[in-house]
């Protein structure tokens, strides 16, 4: 071939390569293909394990322990560091112990423990005999505790010798005996309504646990990563992640619970390179005074869910953490979204990403729909009876399609609660969808963004207000450490008026805070109907969240804004102070009992909101 022809071919090849690279960058084809391939490999791994009668995560852990031997496996404050061999031996000891108690495959054992190595030994030991733990929130007591134990259908309850746990067990001891539950103390182990239990099936957990490399690039092995867990392991995020680490050969570090003062000390002393967060944990870390320890750790990756978008860059800049892995997933396991963020701004704040292929694949599987704001039910056309699909870029409650009723295990022995999450005949006769209860949107680039938990959305002046959006704007103020936004009922007004409970920082007080500046910020960043009518200044940072570091709006919402009611639903809040923004006001001003009485009255002098 003539030189000119070769050049022509080379040019065409280069152009083709450049075009392919452009399309890949634009449509994210390689990323989507890799994600689909991972899912297929996980399914194949599970199918192979079923054929070999080894479809339990315990066998993955057993193989990891055989490979890693004396390498460090579990670190915990106040405990010796356990090797993989020691961890495996302790798990087997517990397996024999539970078998001797009469526990058999398919049964559950109640576990009421703080994070500790013993919890992991017990969990893995139960898996070794085909049983499983029923992990119970160690903050529960009284009726809620008995409810969870009864729901587990367990004959045994292993509990912590910590004084608060043991005292709560003793308080309900007679009631446990009435339901034939034997409480066994483990010595030396160092939002509304009663809880529902979402079972984590082997078919759901095994595929992800069997895959390497991990989702966010975590590295197994003696010179690999170590993940720090201070979030409760009885929650899905922490518990599943920690077990998956052990099944994958990734060592872990445990703290009994989150401690702001001990957090970075633990990361440094344990040599952790990763930690898992939930909810407001990152905000708490940022609220602490700057310290040399902010950069003395080895943490390179944090991952979890619920990290407010306005905190991503602040966290990375202050603590020198290069990677953030945000995900969205329901404990029920019907929908999972992932976003690996390394900076640069593209996709900042996203909880997941779908390229062109995944957007096509899941077009009818993950669907935003219109919700009736008054009833909270899916809106249906009076003519057809079907739901209204909303544009992805606008967003709405996400429904996840189920191929059959058996595709979701449902809540453990809670058929009524299970049925409330299922909806049929959504877009056509015979279809079946799962209600996530969460509103998300997806932009033109395929990034998914969390809008709100719909139960927390409120309607004001005919508009739906996103509590997350309002909270993010408040969180950007230099003197606000934490903001919890919700809607409150006000006499003589329809819907709910916005209220934000805030905690201050930088020595700011209600009297020194620049209320004019805050008012200007809110009015410039939010539509008028979304600007909170009321602001409640709390006494402390961190007092507005649940044990899982997620904002608990219910007590604050139920207490409302009547100053006389302060402390009736929120213990220790008697010294909180209310401020409000009446129509036409230039800034927030104190809200008094007299103001409440005027709002409640029928005179023409009643203030406008």
UniProtKB/Swiss-Prot annotation:
SUPFAM superfamilies given for it?
Acetyl-CoA synthetase-like
| Pathway entry | Antibiotic biosynthesis; cephalosporin C biosynthesis
Substrates-to-products reaction catalysed: isopenicillin N = penicillin N
> What start and end residues bound the annotated signal peptide?
none
Coiled-coil stretches noted in the UniProt entry, renumbered to this chain: none
GO CC annotation: cytoplasmic side of plasma membrane; lipid droplet; peroxisome
Q: Does the keyword Ligase apply?
A: yes
Q: Which key words tag this protein in UniProt?
A: Antibiotic biosynthesis, Isomerase, Ligase
Where does the chain bind AMP? Answer: 185-196
Q: Which GO terms describe its biological process?
A: long-chain fatty acid import into cell; penicillin biosynthetic process
- Chain spans, region Disordered: 545-570
Tell me one Pfam family matched here: AMP-binding
Tell me its EC number(s), please. Answer: 5.1.1.17, 6.2.1.-
Q: Which GO terms describe its molecular function?
A: isopenicillin-N epimerase activity; long-chain fatty acid transmembrane transporter activity; long-chain fatty acid-CoA ligase activity
Query: So what family is this one in?
Result: Belongs to the ATP-dependent AMP-binding enzyme family.
Q: What is this protein's function per UniProt?
A: Together with cefD2, catalyzes the reversible isomerization between isopenicillin N and penicillin N. This two-component IPN epimerase system may function by two sequential steps, an activation of isopenicillin N by the acyl-CoA synthase component cefD1, followed by epimerization by the acyl-CoA racemase component cefD2.
In Swiss-Prot or TrEMBL terms, this protein is called Isopenicillin N epimerase component 1
Please tell me the species this chain comes from.
Answer: Hapsidospora chrysogena (Acremonium chrysogenum)
Read off the lineage from the record.
Eukaryota, Fungi, Dikarya, Ascomycota, Pezizomycotina
Q: Which gene encodes it?
A: cefD1
